Amino acid sequence: MGRDIMVSLEEAVIARYTSHGEKFEILVDPYLAAKLKEGQNVDFDELLAIEVVFRDASKGEKAPEELLSKIFGTTDVKEIAKKIILKGQVQLTAKQREEIREQKKRQIITIISRNTINPQTDTPHPPHRIEKAMEELRINIDIYKSAEEQVPEIVKKLKKVLPIRFEKRDIAVKIPAEFASKAYNALYQFGAVKQEEWQPDGSLIVLIEIPSGIEAEFYAHLNKITKGNVQTKVVKKYSE
């Protein structure tokens, strides 16, 4: 949820850090602060409502530069802000927490749907089924951990109520010469190309590894690009 300009003072929340008996506060975009806490890169010009480190933001009391240098080893506000957010507390409202949690839940469901299958049917679980199972199990979403980091543990829990496993597939693809150049770039959007061979007639043969959950999407995209003139074959499956 990035912004083109810095967050306004009205929308900003306080991030607070205490060290050596001293309190330090900054005014930040709550959503970008959450992204930073989970390890993402953010634009500090958008993150900070004002480039000032306070002792007490509500009173407008600034922290002296000598104190900043003593505690943080620098007076660079952006460097200090990063430490305050990562080591301290961000004062989110209940609404902001719920918005971030919902956004993260959607990311987690998408990742699971794309990277796992139902081994009984050899097809992916639709997102709504995954969401229903998560609700049934009352799975907690950590707003300060990335979606990717939380997926493995959540899938373990889902196994209690769903037949589910992580799986990847190696797929051999042959594309006619007239569509090869256009399809070439599209292939890399779906997975890891392990081998590629350009044939004398200009056609392209590729071995690509993709998450099993996007196999149907992969075929549909190739068929659209090649107008149905594509050959595919699943060569190998990797399960976890």
Swiss-Prot record:
GO terms for biological process: cytosolic ribosome assembly. Pfam families: SBDS_C, SBDS_domain_II, SBDS_N. PROSITE patterns: UPF0023 (PS01267). InterPro entries: EFG_III/V, Ribosome_mat_SBDS_CS, Ribosome_mat_SBDS_N_sf, Sdo1/SBDS, Sdo1/SBDS-like, SDO1/SBDS_C, SDO1/SBDS_central, Sdo1/SBDS_central_sf. NCBIfam families: RNA_SBDS. Belongs to the SDO1/SBDS family. This is Ribosome maturation protein SDO1 homolog. It comes from Methanocaldococcus jannaschii (strain ATCC 43067 / DSM 2661 / JAL-1 / JCM 10045 / NBRC 100440) (Methanococcus jannaschii).
